[in-house]
Design a protein with these regions (language model features):
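Carbohydrate-active catalytic/glycan-binding domains of CAZyme proteins
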Residues: 1-224
Length: 224
């Protein structure tokens, strides 16, 4: 008889919020942030990828660090890494997308295996080199999600929509790129990091919800 499955499903003292489950091969992998008990910041830990056989979801293991926080773009470890997501590219490699805390860009990691170790691959950019999140029609990037369709097309979802009082508070803390325009989707080129077409708005935010039917329940955060 197999053991019962229960929550929390990971070992005591392991905190992986924002979990994104994906099946690769015969294992279920969970990609998420890495929080610390009694911490003073959200998710200051290195990325870990926990996995289990699809036919035995009681047997969760994590054999290595998937990506260290003190990597490119964060050598001093000042920033935290928030909710990631992962997909397999047409080349068979695995691409992980994430944002540092309130840094308006999407970082891309790549690995030959689903659980890493991942290496830094670059940022999502428009064809002209502009970072996605800083273009004219872009939204603020936050907690991205990634989806590869059956036809091979790859779509990136992101967005953050703080209300006016929260935007003012964040601006006072020196965070100037906070927007309130909701969530977007962009299709990526085959290189998995270049925007292929103009971003499309999916769900309005506090700033632009009037007359849409989303008033009072606008997009806030976490496309992932």
């Amino acid at each position: 008889m197999q053991r019962l499955i229960w929550n929390p499903y990971l070992p005591e003292g392991t905190f992986i919020p924002d979990g994104e489950p994906h099946v690769f091969g015969n294992r279920l992998y969970v990609y998420g942030s890495h929080d610390k008990g009694r911490g003073m910041r959200y998710c200051p830990g290195d990325y870990q990828v926990w996995s289990a056989p699809v036919d035995d979801l009681t047997n969760w293991t994590c054999e290595k660090t998937a990506y260290h926080r003190r990597g490119k773009g964060n050598r001093l470890g000042i920033r935290c890494m928030w909710a990631p997501d992962c997909t397999q590219g047409a080349d068979g490699r695995y691409y992980l997308y994430f944002c540092f805390d309130f840094q308006n860009k999407v970082n891309v990691l790549v690995s030959n295996t689903p659980d890493g170790p991942f290496r830094y691959y670059g940022e999502v950019r428009h064809p002209n080199g502009t970072l996605y999140g800083q273009g004219k029609d872009d939204i603020m990037c936050f907690d991205p999600a990634i989806f590869r369709d059956d036809d091979g097309s790859v779509y990136l979802y992101s967005g953050y929509s703080a209300n006016e009082s929260l935007r003012k508070m964040l601006n006072q803390r020196g965070i100037r790129n906070v927007d309130g325009t909701g969530g977007q989707v962009v299709r990526l080129q085959a290189d998995m990091r270049t925007v292929a077409e103009k971003p499309r708005m999916l769900i309005p935010g506090y700033k632009n919800s009037a007359g849409t039917g989303f008033e009072g329940h606008e997009m806030y955060e976490a496309s992932s």
